[in-house]
Swiss-Prot record:
The lineage of its organism: Eukaryota, Viridiplantae, Streptophyta, Embryophyta, Tracheophyta. The keyword GTP-binding does not apply. Residues 207-229 are annotated as: Disordered. This is tRNA (guanine(37)-N(1))-methyltransferase 1. Gene3D superfamilies: Met-10+ protein-like domains, Vaccinia Virus protein VP39. Keywords: Cytoplasm, Methyltransferase, Mitochondrion, Nucleus, S-adenosyl-L-methionine, Transferase, tRNA processing. It is found in: Mitochondrion matrix; Nucleus; Cytoplasm. S-adenosyl-L-methionine binds at residues 425, 463-464, 491-492, 514. One of its GO terms (biological process) is tRNA N1-guanine methylation. GO terms for cellular component: cytoplasm; mitochondrial matrix; nucleus.
Amino acid sequence: MVTKLFLRPHSLSFTLLSGIHLFPKTSLSKPITLCLLSTTATTPILTLTQTLDPNLSYGPSLHKGTKPLNHQNHQLIAATPGEEECVFDKEAFTRVFNLTAIRVPSKDCFALENRLRGHLLNWPRIRNVARVPGDEVEDGLVKLLGEKRNSSDGSESEGDFDSLNRRIYGKAEGDGEILSPVLYRDTLAKTFDSQGFANFRNLAKLSRPKKKKRRKEEERSEGKKRTGKNEFAMVEVVEDGEEGEDLRGLLGEEFKRKRWRGSTRLLLLDERYADKGVEELPEAIKAVLKEDTGQSMTSTFELVKCKLTLFYNYWQMNEILEALLPEGMIVPSAFEMVGHIAHLNLRDEHLPYKKLIAKVVLDKNKPKIQTVVNKTDAIHNDYRTMQLEVLAGNRSLVTTVIENGMRFQVDLATVYWNSRLATERQRLLNCFTRNDVVCDVFSGVGPIAISAAKKVKRVYANDLNPYAIEYLESNSVLNKLERKIKVFNMDGRRFINAMFTSDKAESITQVVMNLPNDAAEFLDAFRGIFRKKSRDKQLKLPMIHVYGFSKAQDPEFDFHQRIRIALSEVAVDVEMHRVRLVAPGKWMLRASFILPKSVVFAKAVLYM
């Protein structure tokens, strides 16, 4: 799996100070402090300063909103010299936004959401329909409690709930004054009959334990996640439009001073309407409120003030890094994934902050990412292994990669793997048929050889790296293809000579040479491979697929020239394909051509 890397600058101002620790203040308009340490020495201390722009773009931003009061004095837990991990205060990224919402019955919320879609919040990863504690009432309870009814003269008559509520709290009928304990007991005694409760039968039903089995703990916890605070956001009602009766005695503390209306939901309105009254709202919203008022003497829709709190987990990786890194620095916003490992290629300017960047990458991509590494040097050795530094997470570099439906175990410390070539490998596999016999000269752990073995007749795979051969053999067994793959561990030229001087030579139809730095230099090994055979014999010459890099202005012409020089053959019909741009001005290419007859019957090249 590959994540493309996009680098972009940002506009947060940066000040370099001296000191040991960095501390975030109440908002990004004040300094945020970081602890940036290496294993050998401390780096300069950085303080980040941001100026709020009154014309910020639509949507949530760390530049907008306020910090909650209990986080005003939060400071970073700074690491001390010698610690490997860089720790920063995640609470410093909590932001509170004041909003207006419409409280509506739960049965109407989705229809109204579609109707008012353009006037709702519509923020990424935030639902327009919000839940708060106490907004859900079971259907059975609603039926028992009933609701207020409108009489024929337009006045509201007493509902079942009002009568029941008075009896629960010992209030008199009519004026609703609280009865003395003696009168209350006397009233209760008169309501009894031979069958038990008469007027209290609803209360008796409420007090009985449920006959159904209680839900499992997992189900109850799942239901709780839908209300209140979750891992990245929380909605709270700050101000109700109207106070009602105190329902704590019947329904619990969550229903203190709420007007009875059954199960409800909040439709979060656009942030533009946060401080506006009803008359200032758009006509579409006012029409909904008027329709509801016209249908009933008591409106079931209600405007409420609420606040939306966004936590550290809400913000994207690039937003966090943009807030933490100095002004003008390019923000690394993506990386390559190899199994559970995130592979960074940090620039020199990022190295003082590598621990910080790795920490954010790990936080924002759990659980699929468990290790973050950075390449410390270019590939120079014959085994093509990279020098990697583990920056965060698990120290193990052994992982499992799934590609083209196959599983590959790799150890990035001892073998080479590039996930960015997955598309090219699939494109190459599409060139093969079920009758092909493939010869992979530089197979590595087998991304091409094993994937091809599922499709073609036979595969011969070779690599110089003994660790790669071990993983190649285990991966072939892992994918149940060991019977179709024969593995070799030798130099590329020796392998080509051994294969094409054996009885297998005439069966080989495809040769893959995926060693972009040096593959073209191995083409001279094909000169004279059939020199001992008769020219009159009908031979099916193999198709060669060779990869290479080119920094030339015309990369195709440059690579074609190198192929002709290596083969000592002028007339070579080559099909070129640009694989990817690996660096500014540097292309990776694939050249495909049928091995010329004049090359295979030429005199052999002597190697000194």
